[in-house]
Amino acid sequence: MAETKSGKSGLISHGVAAQNRKARFDYTIKETVEAGLVLKGPEVKSLRHGRATLSEAWAGERDGEMFLFNAYIPEYQGGVLSRFEPRSPRKLLLKRKQINHLLGAVQKQGQTVVPLQIHFNERGMAKVLLGVAEGRNKADKRAAIASRDWQRDKARLMREKG
């Protein structure tokens, strides 16, 4: 999904606002689920400027509801001073069936729910793409790097010959 920024303001109207690139390297993603995100006004503005970080974020359960923990959305600098905690838990909007499915996956050994990206849909709503993931060990990570390098070398050889 490509970022589309509105003219002079440089704000993201729809498209990817933040991405967790390290999650796809550290985990094997089994399935993905899209969830809504409850945000305050300044948090939305900060996201539209593309200033969020998901590298240390994770999703978990609290009181029967799913929350996004440790996602860094900094304070919006261009407006009225409104104090909020940049790493506060943010509620995820999911149906009960989806929550039960995710919690069932978490109960399995070694699986976790990680946020893969925050994006704005065509209607301008903030959404989080969650992945049900299984941790990788060092050997798996090395194999992924070797495979990626081989694909790059193969493409380079084909360009040179072809």
UniProtKB/Swiss-Prot annotation:
<comment type="function">
    <text>Required for rescue of stalled ribosomes mediated by trans-translation. Binds to transfer-messenger RNA (tmRNA), required for stable association of tmRNA with ribosomes. tmRNA and SmpB together mimic tRNA shape, replacing the anticodon stem-loop with SmpB. tmRNA is encoded by the ssrA gene; the 2 termini fold to resemble tRNA(Ala) and it encodes a 'tag peptide', a short internal open reading frame. During trans-translation Ala-aminoacylated tmRNA acts like a tRNA, entering the A-site of stalled ribosomes, displacing the stalled mRNA.</text>
</comment>
<dbReference type="GO" id="GO:0070929">
    <property type="term" value="P:trans-translation"/>
</dbReference>
<dbReference type="Pfam" id="PF01668">
    <property type="entry name" value="SmpB"/>
</dbReference>
<keyword id="KW-0694">RNA-binding</keyword>
<comment type="similarity">
    <text>Belongs to the SmpB family.</text>
</comment>
<dbReference type="InterPro" id="IPR020081">
    <property type="entry name" value="SsrA-bd_prot_CS"/>
</dbReference>
<dbReference type="GO" id="GO:0005829">
    <property type="term" value="C:cytosol"/>
</dbReference>
<dbReference type="InterPro" id="IPR023620">
    <property type="entry name" value="SmpB"/>
</dbReference>
<dbReference type="GO" id="GO:0003723">
    <property type="term" value="F:RNA binding"/>
</dbReference>
<dbReference type="InterPro" id="IPR000037">
    <property type="entry name" value="SsrA-bd_prot"/>
</dbReference>
<keyword id="KW-0963">Cytoplasm</keyword>
<protein>
    <recommendedName>
        <fullName>SsrA-binding protein</fullName>
    </recommendedName>
</protein>
